[in-house]
Amino acid sequence: MTIAIGQEKTRGGFDLVDDWLKRDRFVFVGWSGLLLFPCAYLAVGGWLTGTTFVTSWYTHGLASSYLEGCNFLTAAVSTPANSMGHSLLFLWGPEAQGDFTRWCQIGGLWAFIALHGSFGLIGFCLRQFEIARLVGLRPYNAIAFSGPIAVFVSVFLMYPLGQASWFFAPSLGVAAIFRFLLFLQGFHNWTLNPFHMMGVAGILGGALLCAIHGATVQNTLFEDGDAADTFRAFTPTQSEETYSMVTANRFWSQIFGVAFSNKRWLHFFMLFVPVTGLWTSAFGIVGLALNLRAYDFVSQELRAAEDPEFETFYTKIILXDEGIRSWMAAQDQPHENFIFPEEVLPRGNAL
């Protein structure tokens, strides 16, 4: 008989921390939580602080806080002043020099929230990877969440990095985002951009697929219990299906002539459509950061300029964009002292 005497492996500090982070608790922490929770807390806290107390008078010439009379829809944390360029605006940096009030006045809170928000979203994505790995799931949730991350990073970081300063990013508020949308339309003709079209198709297509899928499952639920309502007619741990894929397939085959043949392809398509839409719109925003143009139908513009009776929906959009630029540039960038002579302002359909 052979007796093997082994020495118990000593556990290092890393193993102890790993065990504590992955302990089963009400709110899982994990290694990703070390990035997610502090960044999310600071980003949300910074936004609540900014919308409550901090003015945009010094950066945009606007009132933007509850303290100044704004409400939830009009309050915002505004982007830094154009003169700040692409500085990270550290509180201890040369701009604020440790003065918290000055830091808020020049837009330091926006940079603080945008950067911590970006890392918070990345932390949330990593959290989905980590938990999926621990419980033995595929990582498609995390892959899908890369879409919102791509849009956030492209809009709040990549776009202003391609422009003159952080000033041209969206301020963090509801009405502020609407103003940014008008800006993108007026200066980039964004709605006519094919990447925007693909993004809209992806998001609205995903919503349509979600509605169809939910309704179809509800329509084909089995009556496999004696409970009073549908939701109590099955148990979450039962091995049998609770709805009929065959019935759903026959129904949509009659409606459209085609239908998904299996659940894997169906659910992959529901994943693919909206995530692809988000990614394509993010690519489009990066293109706008580089001032790339899309779909300039110059022949129609030239003919409209020569013939007062010729007008298309495209030339009407171009006129509207000119109006947005001429009104918004002076309003939105008062520090530039823009003055537009009468002859460059849009009039009729004469471009």
Curated annotation (Swiss-Prot):
This is Photosystem II D2 protein. The chain crosses the membrane at residues 39-59, 123-139, 151-164, 206-226, 277-293. Chlorophyll a PD2 binds at H196. Fe cation binds at H213, H267. Pheophytin a binds at Q128, N141. One of its GO terms (molecular function) is electron transporter, transferring electrons within the cyclic electron transport pathway of photosynthesis activity. Photosystem II (PSII) is a light-driven water:plastoquinone oxidoreductase that uses light energy to abstract electrons from H(2)O, generating O(2) and a proton gradient subsequently used for ATP formation. It consists of a core antenna complex that captures photons, and an electron transfer chain that converts photonic excitation into a charge separation. The D1/D2 (PsbA/PsbD) reaction center heterodimer binds P680, the primary electron donor of PSII as well as several subsequent electron acceptors. D2 is needed for assembly of a stable PSII complex. It is a multi-pass membrane protein. Its main location: plastid. It comes from the Eukaryota. It is found in: Plastid, Chloroplast thylakoid membrane. Keywords: Chlorophyll, Chloroplast, Chromophore, Electron transport, Iron, Magnesium, Membrane, Metal-binding, Oxidoreductase, Photosynthesis, Photosystem II, Plastid, Thylakoid, Transmembrane, Transmembrane helix, Transport. InterPro entries: D1/D2, Photo_II_D1/D2_sf, Photo_RC_L/M, Photo_RC_L/M_CS, PSII_PsbD/D2. NCBIfam families: psbD. Its EC number is 1.10.3.9. 2 of the reaction center chlorophylls (ChlD1 and ChlD2) are entirely coordinated by water. The lineage of its organism: Eukaryota, Rhodophyta, Bangiophyceae, Bangiales, Bangiaceae. It catalyses: 2 a plastoquinone + 4 hnu + 2 H2O = 2 a plastoquinol + O2. It is an enzyme of class 1 (oxidoreductase). GO terms for cellular component: chloroplast thylakoid membrane; photosystem II. Belongs to the reaction center PufL/M/PsbA/D family. Pfam families: Photo_RC (PF00124). GO terms for biological process: photosynthetic electron transport in photosystem II. Chlorophyll a ChlzD2 binds at H116.
